[in-house]
Amino acid sequence: MKIFFTNPPLRELHFSRSQRSPGVIKSGTMYYPYWLAHAAALAESRDHEIYLLDCPADFINRDGLLQQIEDQKPDLIVLDTSTPSINFDLQTVEKIRQITDAKILMVGTHVTSEWHHCLEACPALDFIAMGEYDFTVSELAESLESKSPIREIAGLAYRDQSNSGSLIQTDVRLPIEDMDELPWIAPIYKRFLTPENYLFTIASQPMIMLIGGRGCKAKCFYCVYPQVMHGHNYRTRSLPHLIGEMKWIEQNMPEIKEIVFED
């Protein structure tokens, strides 16, 4: 199955959606879409064809996104979300539905918390993957291909087409225990993204963003990720897995001057 992953636009703005406090930052800060990249890398490792488009970083507006979707002709479209952008995100889903019959899946912090409201508000939206969605995306693609029951996929919400459109939430998707199950994301960055379009102000440029693990014991008021996405139990990648990716960056992306760990 061909899966189109996108960090969608927010109007014409340079909107940094992946950071703890999403927004248009005066410094020009722009985070990598590392959550999407992990899901894309995993999907490719399971023999799906992937495409990743980061609209805010590449200054691509909604019309540009729609054109890319028409050009790529995906079977499944995965859109990231955030609370500041959600109204525009849902409008984007409606626009996408006008040009394709591909299934549309939303992921991220806002839809994880407000899945019921988002499905009710947007009839064009097919699915929501809640929490750590890496495996959910791939399992959904495989279920759609094989026409097997999607009710068995954990971490999913959707509209039941056989029961008057009632909304269904499947079992909770537990956080990934073995972080080495996730493939490296640096090769995904190299193929689909432009490092010069990302900025972390205290890092040398161009920089790249990785994670050493997921989960956080802290309860910072400005960060929803532990409560919504990855929980409070910190799970780390093994040193060989992590160092191997760093060496790959050194050898294959010599322009990178610094690696930022966004744990």
Regions from the PLM with identified roles:
Residues M1, K73, Q205-P206:
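A short, charged/proline- and glycine-enriched loop
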Residues K2, E49, K103, K257-E258:
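Residues at the starts of beta-strands that form the adenosine-phosphate
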Residues P9, F15-Q19, I153, R159-M209:
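N-terminal [4Fe-4S]-dependent radical SAM core
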Residues I185-D263:
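Radical SAM [4Fe-4S] cluster-binding motif and immediate context
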Residues W35, L42-I176:
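Glycine-rich beta-alpha loop elements in corrinoid/cobalamin-binding modules
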Residues F4-N7, D54, V78-D80, M106-V107, ...:
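Short beta-strand segments
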Residues M1-G28:
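Short glycine-rich His-centered loop
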Residues G28-H38, H241:
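Conserved alpha-helical elements of sugar-nucleotide-dependent glycosyltransferases
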